[in-house]
Amino acid sequence: DYYASRGLGDVYKRQVDIEIEAPDEHLEYVRTLAREYGCWLIVSFHDFEGTPSLDELKGIARLCRTKGADLVKIVTTAWNISDAARTMRLYDLQADGALFEGAAAAERPQLVAFSMGEAGKFTRLLCLKLGAPYTYVSAGASNATASGQYTREEMERLLSAENYPFEGFREFRRTTVAVPCSKSVAQRAVLAAALAAGESRLANYAPCNDIVGAVEVIRGMGCRIASDGTTLHIEGVGAERLGRCTKIETGESGLLTRLLTPLASHISALNGGAPVEISGHGSILKRNLHEAVAALREAGVHCSAREEGYLPFRIEGGITRREISFSGRESSQTVSGFLMTLPLLQDATVLTVTEPSSIPYLELTLRTLTRFGVRLNREAFYDGVCGGTPSKIVFSVPGRQEYRPSDVFLEADWSSAAYFAVAGAVASSLGRTEGITLRNMRLDSLQADEKILDILRSCGADVSVAPADASARGDMPGDLQNISVTATGRRLKAFEVDATHCPDLFPILAVLAAHCDGTSRIAGVGRLTQKESNRAETIYAEFRTLGARIDIRGDEMFVTGGPLHGGDVRSHNDHRIAMSLIVAGLFTPEPVRLDDVKCIDKSFPSFLDLLARQE
C-alpha cells in the first residue's frame, strides 16, 4: 500500500502498525520499540466481512486507544451506503469529542477510518476531507491489495486543486425567476406529437440536452420540425409510418430511453421483425436499465442488452402478450413507455404494474395521452385500508387507437424551480433577501417535484400564490400562477418527507436540511442508485465534504442542520448534483469549487445565467 496524505506529497514513514488482536506481549514489545525510535504507533482493526454496529465501532476505537495508539485505524467492509455511512460516523463523534470520552484533547489519538469494497470506495477519499491524516492507495491498477482502492495517480488527481476550475457564486440576490419548461412534460409531448399524423404546437419550448435529444429522435423518424420563437411546430408522421427507423440514439436521457424501448418493439413489428437498436452516450451507458429489459421480455419481445441491462439494446419483434405484468418499483418511466405504445397495438392489452413508484409521473403520462386523444382505463389496488400508495395498478388499454395532433403549453419545470425556491427560502431566512417569486408556474402540474412547496411550508417558510399574467401562455389552455417563497425573520426548522415519488428533489433537499434547525429525515434512498450517478453516494460524499452532517440508514437519509463550509467537490457528471452544490455554495464563507458543470446542460442550460443575475 501507498499513503496519500492531505498534503499531497507528505508521506508518513515513521509509523508502525499492529493489529488490535495481537497478543499483549507482542503489542507491548512493538509499542516499546515505537517509543524508542520515535515512531507513531498505529493500532488497527480490520473487518473483511462487513461493518459492525456503531456502538461496536466506538468500543473498538476506544480499545485501540487503551492499547497505546497514536493513531486508530478502523477499516470495515461496506456492502451498501448504510455500511459506509456508519463507519464515517466515527469522524462526527471524534469532532464532537465523544469518540474518546474522558480523554484530554492532547491525549486523543488521530483517526483513519474507511470502508473496503466498491460500495465503500468513496470513503477512501472522503476520510481525508473529514480529518484523516492520510489514506491508502495502490501503486497501480494491478497492484491493489484490497477491494475499492484508488491508484496513487487517481487519488492525486482527485486531490489536486487545479482539477476543480469552476468557482461557484458567493451571493444570491434574486427576487424573481421564470424557469424553463419541464423536460419530463416536453419529452412526452414530443413523442406523442410524432405519433400523431399532422401538426402539433408545443408552446413555451426551451431546449436542453434531453429535450433536444427527443426532438432529434423524432426528426430521424421522419417528422418535420420548425421553431417559431418559443413554440415548437411538429409535423407528426403517425405511428404506422415509423417502420423504417432501425437505430435510435437517446443521448444521456434515462426517460427518453425507457419511453422508447416499448415503441422500438412496435417499430420492429411494423418492419417485419427487423431489429431496432437503442443506444446513447455518456452517463446513460453506465446506468443499469435491467428493469426495462425485463419488462420487454415479459411482454414477449426479444431484447438483448450488454451485461443484461446496459445499452445498447437490440430489440426484435413486437409485443405479443395481451396480459403483461411487471414491477414498477425501480422506475415509472418504463411503465410510461408501455402506456404510450400499447394503444397502437391491434388488440386490447391489460398491463399490471406491481409496486408502482413515482406515481405523479404516471399521471403526467396519462394527461399527455388524453391531450393527444388516447384513452385507457386504470384501477388501483391497495393492501389493507384504501389510501396511500397502491400495491398495484391495472391498466386496461384498448388497441387500434390513433394519436391526434394537439396544441400543448409546456409547463415550467418544478425540478428546476426547486433550486431557486430553496435558495430564496434560505437567503430570506438569513436576512439576505425578502424571498423569491417563481413566475408562471402551474399548481396542478402533476409533476412530482411540486412537492417542494409543501416541504418548504413544513420548514416554516411562507408560500403564497397569485395569478400570473395571462399573456404568458398565449392562446394555450391552462392557468398559471406566481409563487412567492419567503422565510424572512425566522429560522427554518427540520422536516420529514417521503421522497420515494419525487427522488429528483433529494440533492436540493440536502441543501435545505443543512440550513434547518434540527435533524431532517428524507425517505426513499432506494430510488437514488440508478440516476445519472449513484445519488445516495454522491449526495453523501459531496455534502459531507462541505461539512454537512448526513447519515444514511436503510431507506432513510438524516441531515442535521449546521454551518457548511467551502471545498472542492465533484459533480459526478450529474446535473442535479452540480446545481445543488452550486446552491449550497451561495451560503458558505469559503468558495465551493466544482470539477465540471457542463452536465447542467442536460436539463437546465440557463441555470448559471439565471442564478448569477441580480434582479
What feature does the model see in each segment?
Residues 1, 42-46, 71-75, 138, ...:
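Short beta-strands and strand-loop turn motifs
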Residues 2-12:
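Single conserved hydrophobic/aromatic residue that forms the stacking wall/gate
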Residues 7, 37, 130-132, 221, ...:
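Short, structured coil segments at secondary-structure junctions
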Residues 10, 30-34, 63-67, 127, ...:
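Generic structural signal for hydrophobic
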Residues 13-27, 258, 266:
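Ordered, amphipathic secondary-structure segments that act as subunit-interaction surfaces
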Residues 19-22, 79-85, 113-117, 355-361, ...:
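Active-site glycine- and acidic-residue-rich loops that bind
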Residues 21-160:
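Catalytic alpha/beta core domains of metabolic enzymes, predominantly
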Residues 156-615:
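Short, structured segments at the rim of ligand-binding sites
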